[in-house]
């Protein structure tokens, strides 16, 4: 069976989106299926129309050049047109049995055009509602024109594809509330391959010395620094934690839109000796940094996005036998059963975060 995956972006870029995609492709290939892959013009850094990475071949879509295509709203349709044009080029060559389009809805809409044109069944995988992420990133306003159009477009896609998959019950409930039959929606949860992680391994002492973490109790966060992750809240909780545990240290690994804000906040609070900020690190080194941490903290703020969507990072920490503390937003509550596989604290409350850390220690 030949499956053509229609993606926003892909490896070699590093993101939760690309890692989940890669895992899906690997598992489908283990089933003996042939997978093919195309990315939209939103993929960054393409150097050729066809690229190979990690044993996978990716067809890249052209980036729209016209100044007209840079206008708000119009630029989104330019992405769809570019993707449809590239699909028209490769469909006759690949002759896929199934189209598997992945969020966002722009991919789903382009795939829907092609599915009807070539009479190919279409599965749409919804990983999050991108209009909600856009609100957090500051590129859309909740209830604004772009927000409304994005939601309407994805609802249209939901209604017309052959089948829908999504990553959690929160998303399935929301999709069903739009009049989509529940039997059309399958939840395929976020997961990690435990064979790719080590369990309960001691921290590398050379790295501990380098980071200044020897004989310290280490809180940690490894991931992208988006506003909804709530990292400033974690910083606000540190002084109270330090009154009981002056040996505490916070290891922050990653980067993102809030990186400079977080660095400045660390400086303003005088926490340079407490917070170890590594920036982004090579993917193959991440395991060594996981092993440095005693408690992973995921202080996501309460909002529509975090209440609906389950994250991947807490599962990675669990797979390595690490303690997990997370805010009680809906996405976390779907993953974490208190005192069974983690701990929860009241979202948006730095005092409760600090109290829970102290109680755990």
Task: Please provide the spans of the model-predicted regions.
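N-terminal subdomain of nucleotide-sugar transferases
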Residues: 1-57, 61-62, 241
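Short hydrophobic beta-strand element within catalytic cores of glycosyltransferases
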Residues: 298, 316-319, 323-326
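Carbohydrate-associated surface elements
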Residues: 170, 191
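Short alpha-helical donor nucleotide-sugar binding micro-motif in glycosyltransferases
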Residues: 91, 158, 280-281, 288-293
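Nucleotide-activated donor-binding/catalytic signature segment of Leloir-type glycosyltransferases, i.e.
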Residues: 253, 260-287
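A short helix/loop element that forms part of the nucleotide-sugar donor recognition site in Leloir-type
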Residues: 49-50, 198-213
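Conserved donor-binding/catalytic core segment of Leloir-type glycosyltransferases
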Residues: 4, 213-238
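Conserved acidic donor-binding segment of nucleotide-sugar-dependent glycosyltransferases
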Residues: 338-339, 343-350, 359-361
């Amino acid at each position: 069976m030949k499956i053509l995956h229609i993606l926003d972006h892909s490896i070699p870029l590093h993101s939760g989106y690309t890692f989940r995609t890669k895992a899906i492709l690997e598992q489908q290939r283990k089933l003996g299926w042939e997978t093919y892959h195309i990315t939209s013009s939103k993929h960054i850094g393409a150097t050729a129309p066809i690229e190979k990475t990690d044993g996978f071949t990716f067809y890249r879509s052209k980036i729209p050049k016209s100044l007209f295509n840079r206008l708000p709203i119009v630029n989104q349709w330019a992405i769809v047109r570019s993707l449809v044009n590239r699909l028209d080029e490769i469909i006759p060559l690949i002759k896929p049995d199934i189209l598997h389009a992945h969020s966002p809805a722009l991919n789903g809409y382009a795939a829907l055009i092609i599915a009807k044109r070539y009479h190919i069944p279409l599965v749409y995988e919804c990983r999050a509602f991108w209009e909600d992420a856009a609100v957090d990133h500051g590129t859309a306003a909740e209830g604004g024109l772009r927000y409304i159009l994005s939601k309407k477009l994805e609802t249209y896609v939901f209604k017309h594809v052959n089948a829908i998959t999504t990553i959690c019950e929160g998303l399935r409930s929301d999709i069903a509330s739009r009049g989509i039959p529940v039997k059309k929606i399958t939840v395929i949860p976020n997961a990690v391959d435990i064979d790719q992680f080590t369990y309960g391994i001691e921290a590398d002492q050379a790295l501990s010395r380098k980071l200044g973490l020897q004989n310290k109790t280490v809180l940690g966060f490894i991931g992208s620094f988006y506003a909804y992750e709530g990292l400033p809240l974690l910083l606000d909780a540190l002084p109270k934690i330090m009154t009981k545990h002056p040996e505490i240290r916070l290891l922050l690994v990653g980067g993102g839109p809030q990186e400079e804000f977080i660095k400045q906040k660390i400086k303003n609070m005088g926490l340079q000796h407490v917070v170890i900020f590594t920036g982004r690190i090579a993917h193959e080194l991440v395991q060594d940094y996981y092993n440095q941490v005693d408690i992973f903290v995921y202080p996501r703020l309460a909002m529509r996005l975090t209440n609906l969507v389950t994250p991947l990072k807490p599962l990675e920490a669990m797979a390595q036998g690490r303690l997990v503390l997370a805010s009680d937003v809906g996405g976390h509550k779907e993953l974490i059963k208190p005192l069974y596989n983690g701990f929860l604290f009241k979202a948006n409350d730095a005092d409760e975060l600090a109290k829970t850390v102290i109680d755990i220690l």
